[in-house]
């Protein structure tokens, strides 16, 4: 196919299992490295600042996810649309979709930047952030939001490259940015004693670097993937298609994060030790989840290209292989974290009060993280087929509504930290069962 270049993968021909791994593993590495660099923020403030600084950074994670997940979902929409056009080899539409996606990314980033400055303190107060960390949490969040245009540009540009089968160069950009982030963290916190503001500044600078690298790559690609500044603009037909896929996915992520914000509010009620412990353990949860998410994104891209090319049997194989790989790799990584919990958790804190809560979260949630494969892979396959609303609705019900009901009923009656944590595996089982059933029914009707 003419749009296939040396950095891309031909998803519509040849053996699938090796191409899925070649695509997914750099994608997983990108997400894990991104979280690792975020974990450096947490570890540096936890070890070289204070437990309050650690809690301030950790208390923002669910709120940050809430703000950006809508636009990450839209970037997924651009991935599906561009992948579909690549499968059909419609060059004009590929270019139009790429330029539309970049404009949407930058405009959305500016919007979130401005909005974030106004809502930071009111929302953190509404979440019940402990008084001993509220000022630090607000400071971190406001600085973090300055980098939103660059965060979204990286997400959209990497989505564009991944739609062509290129998951390696986004990884290289992330590695370069992460090295800068780590170095700045150590300098600004340890040497200049800037605390949470130091790690926030380091994050902003690293996001500028990663997005800048990917923009440079797109500016020097061959057509129709090349980004041409004079061609930047919004194509309404392509925007409509991107939003049809992206908005349901984004709203799902946003509502999902809203449920986590409510859970975070409940965690806050246990005090700063619980907030810090949960934040420390959550890092390992993210590592395991991003394995699943990488194979889910692989399912989206491979399914979309093969569906566009009319290769329906390969769509079935993509689902089967991504599910197997997701369960296997996530299960192995979770086992490493759980078995080595004493070593890993002490990287973040030596406070015994904090460790009590961290161990509880690790044993309950991280141990069973592989269960998320059921709904993530199935939902990804459905989006690859062009159906985004159904998996969004299922996820909102199974992983959001159920969690909110649990928090407002069971957790109020039994105010124990482990009671809050156990809703995660419960919701994963329910959501996964419904999602797999929906995918199989949809696939039967489609081909």
Regions inferred by a protein language model and the residue ranges of each:
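Small-residue-rich hydrophobic transmembrane alpha-helices
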Residues: 54-114, 151-170, 277-341, 372-395
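Helix-loop interface residues and adjacent transmembrane-helix termini in multi-pass membrane transporters
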Residues: 39, 48-51, 85-88, 163-164, ...
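Short, proline-centered helix/strand-breaking motifs
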Residues: 26, 62, 186, 341-342
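Transmembrane helix-bundle signature of multi-pass secondary active exporters and lipid flippases
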Residues: 27-80, 144-151, 240-305, 326-333, ...
């Amino acid at each position: 196919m003419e749009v296939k270049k040396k950095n891309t993968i031909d998803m519509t021909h040849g053996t699938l299992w090796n191409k899925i791994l070649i695509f997914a593993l750099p994608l997983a590495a990108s997400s894990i490295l991104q979280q690792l660099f975020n974990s450096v923020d947490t570890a540096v403030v936890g070890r070289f600042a204070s437990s309050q600084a650690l809690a301030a950074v950790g208390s923002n994670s669910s709120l940050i996810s809430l703000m950006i997940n809508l636009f990450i979902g839209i970037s997924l929409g651009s991935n599906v649309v561009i992948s579909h056009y690549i499968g059909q080899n419609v060059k004009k539409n590929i270019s139009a979709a790429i330029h539309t996606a970049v404009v949407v990314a930058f405009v959305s980033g500016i919007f979130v930047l401005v909005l974030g400055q106004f809502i930071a303190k009111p929302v953190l107060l509404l979440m019940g952030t402990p008084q001993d960390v509220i000022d630090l949490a607000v400071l971190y969040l406001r600085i973090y939001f300055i980098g939103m245009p660059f965060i979204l540009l990286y997400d959209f540009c990497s989505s564009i490259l991944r739609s062509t089968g290129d998951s390696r160069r986004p990884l290289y950009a992330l590695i370069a940015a992460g090295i800068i982030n780590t170095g700045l963290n150590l300098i600004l916190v340890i040497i200049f004693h800037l605390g949470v503001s130091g790690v926030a500044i380091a994050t902003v600078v690293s996001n500028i670097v990663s997005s800048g690298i990917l923009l440079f790559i797109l500016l020097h690609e061959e057509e129709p993937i090349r980004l041409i500044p004079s061609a930047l603009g919004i194509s309404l037909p392509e925007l409509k298609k991107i939003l049809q896929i992206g908005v349901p996915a984004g709203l799902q992520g946003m509502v999902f994060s809203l449920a986590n914000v409510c859970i975070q509010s409940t965690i806050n009620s246990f005090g700063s030790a619980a907030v810090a412990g949960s934040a420390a353990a959550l890092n390992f949860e993210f590592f395991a989840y991003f394995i699943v998410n990488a194979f889910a994104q692989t399912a989206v891209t491979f399914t979309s290209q093969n569906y566009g090319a009319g290769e329906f049997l390969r769509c079935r194989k993509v689902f089967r292989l991504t599910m197997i790989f997701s369960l296997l790799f996530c299960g192995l990584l979770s086992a490493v974290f759980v078995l080595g919990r004493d070593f890993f958790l002490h990287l973040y804190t030596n406070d015994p009060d904090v460790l009590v809560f961290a161990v509880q979260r690790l044993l309950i949630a991280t141990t069973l993280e592989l269960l998320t494969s059921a709904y993530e892979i199935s939902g990804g396959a459905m989006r690859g087929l062009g159906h985004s609303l159904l998996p969004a609705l299922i996820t909102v019900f199974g992983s959001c509504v159920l969690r909110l009901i649990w928090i407002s009923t069971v957790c109020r009656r039994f105010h124990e930290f482990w009671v809050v944590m156990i809703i995660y595996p419960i919701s994963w089982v329910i959501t996964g069962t419904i999602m797999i059933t929906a995918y199989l029914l949809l696939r039967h009707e489609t081909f």
